[in-house]
A protein has these predicted regions:
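Conserved acidic carboxylate
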Residues: 16
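Active-site residues of response regulator receiver
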Residues: 67, 95
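Acidic, metal-coordinating helix/loop segments flanking the phosphotransfer/catalytic sites
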Residues: 38-63
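Alpha4 helix (beta4-alpha4-beta5 surface) of REC/receiver domains from two-component response regulators
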Residues: 77, 84, 97-115, 121, ...
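Short amphipathic alpha-helix used as the core "switch/output" element in two-component signaling
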Residues: 47, 76-87
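Non-catalytic signal-transmission and effector/linker regions of two-component phosphorelay proteins
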Residues: 1-13, 23, 32, 53-60, ...
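Acidic catalytic/metal-coordinating carboxylates
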Residues: 41, 74-77
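Two-component/phosphorelay signaling modules centered on CheY-like receiver
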Residues: 19-38, 120
Length: 135
């Protein structure tokens, strides 16, 4: 996909501990013209959000997509920490659990919920709803 000169690709952080799934969906997003950084757990995601944008890519993230069940720092805790530092960051939660299963604690923190197994078309549609200026 060709970007107009005045539009930079939107930057997405994809957080998923299952490497095959993370890589596959990151590639799908890249094929749609998005820049995608990957993290395999919540701790790594915070490191990328805190330093990656300053050191590696010199650009802020536009969206976070995260699994709910992650090793180390659970997805709910990750969402709370993202909200504390970046209150307007849109977040898509992907999970094999129904949205009511983790409880209301996460409902305040995310913009979209996608049930696993992930339908690629549903993922792209959710991203486009949250990043509407991206064609």
């Amino acid at each position: 996909m060709v970007q107009p000169d005045n539009l930079e690709p939107k930057m997405i952080l994809f957080v998923e501990d299952e490497s095959l799934s993370r890589r596959a969906f990151a590639q799908i997003l890249r094929a749609k013209g998005y820049q995608v950084a990957e993290a395999q757990n919540g701790v790594e995601a915070l490191e990328v959000l805190n330093t990656g944008t300053e050191v590696l890519i010199k650009k802020a993230f536009d969206l976070v997509i995260t699994d709910l069940v992650l090793p180390g720092l659970h997805g709910v805790n990750l969402i709370h920490q993202i909200r504390a530092r970046w209150p307007k960051m849109p977040i898509i939660v992907i999970s094999g659990y129904l949205p009511e299963t983790p409880g209301k604690v996460i409902l305040e923190g995310f913009a979209e919920f996608i049930q696993k197994p992930i339908d690629p078309a549903a993922l792209i549609a959710a991203v486009r709803r949250l990043l509407p200026e991206k064609v």
